[in-house]
């Protein structure tokens, strides 16, 4: 005898579900009802499990690839502009002007946008808008040699980069946790406290951070490849990069529902996501029930029940956003500001003054092949820094290392402050032993890159898998909700927690930009002061670069 058991899933935004128990349930959509056949052969069961596992891995790879490309493409133009700063400005104009135009608009986007947004994020429009702004900005830089127009173009690209980072971090919160899997074998509660819990949201953040780290290397390399063609042609070629970001969003990125369909029966029954309005409109081909643009384009509107015509609209008030912001300051935002303020002060204000006599083959065989003139020191420092930023930002995604636990997120800030103090005093007093001074500085810059990258990925990973964000995928009770009022309350709570999670990860994003902006204002006078102090003490190598 065949026993058929139907387990209902929670209704998902943008879909109309009809679940029936009995003979009719065996013909229902398998994406919305789990059917267990007790007479199924072991071989068929193993084959089904293998197929499901393969499908889930493929979908998970798509998610990881998409978010890696988002981080890479969104941040590459920022790096390209910084690398090409000297070629973009007339002679005699300080490169700090490019740095300011390249960071201040991004800070504005990250700091203000989450508070002006009302209701649910429209991700498709955001991605298209970011790509368009970047494209226009790069064309202005390419075809208008006037300083004012180039600064406008740089500012547009910067604003796009800041808004893009905010958008993709918020998008990551729309992906549900993975059952109870952990990297360490701990219970879910223990893993959450230690920052070890795995989730699709955590994977998305990890791979996005890895992409932003890779942008430092690939963006600089891209400019050096097109540089011989000149600013106009080179920048015009690189202006097509945002188009690949749209392709990654439209083609590679899976919907939330696709991830859950790829899981085994247990995983699919435990979690039901709140999808974005884009899932319903742009990926409607994968749904059995047709959706209309008007239904799904309503900002912050969710459907609350099978066959229900009622909608719930959710909008966070400014007071609610302020209440969500306050608990994020001490554990996340302030440490991130300090890390990046110290890090970029080292890179822009102190590192250019850490110049030493050229290494000889007898004393430093390897360095003597890399550093052939005094101007080679600073590019080497930047290459080492970017490499170790990439490695540390990839610690979760590629190297499968745990994130820094929430209660230890201040450690990178303390470490960066200590590194700044050490390198500042070395620049002033040259207290490192001469034979090891330059290799030791390189090692310390490696540590600086590791600390900064690990702080970035750990902060956003911690928020992505935070218990407070679980409203995005709530456990199913396995029972039909008969009372319409209770069902509406549940749907409203789900949608509100989803928006709260989006805001929480979005409001932290301005921390790194604020630190970088502060560092850019400090670094210009600091570099001049340090070099003058070295000259007064009889060391004039900084004047020769």
Curated annotation (Swiss-Prot):
Residues 23-49, 276-304 are annotated as: Disordered. Its main location: membrane. This is Protein BTN1. Belongs to the battenin family. Involved in vacuolar transport and vacuole pH homeostasis. Also required for cytokinesis. It comes from Mycosarcoma maydis (Corn smut fungus). The chain crosses the membrane at residues 66-86, 97-117, 127-147, 205-225, 234-254, 322-342, 408-428, 440-460. InterPro entries: Battenin_disease_Cln3, MFS_trans_sf.
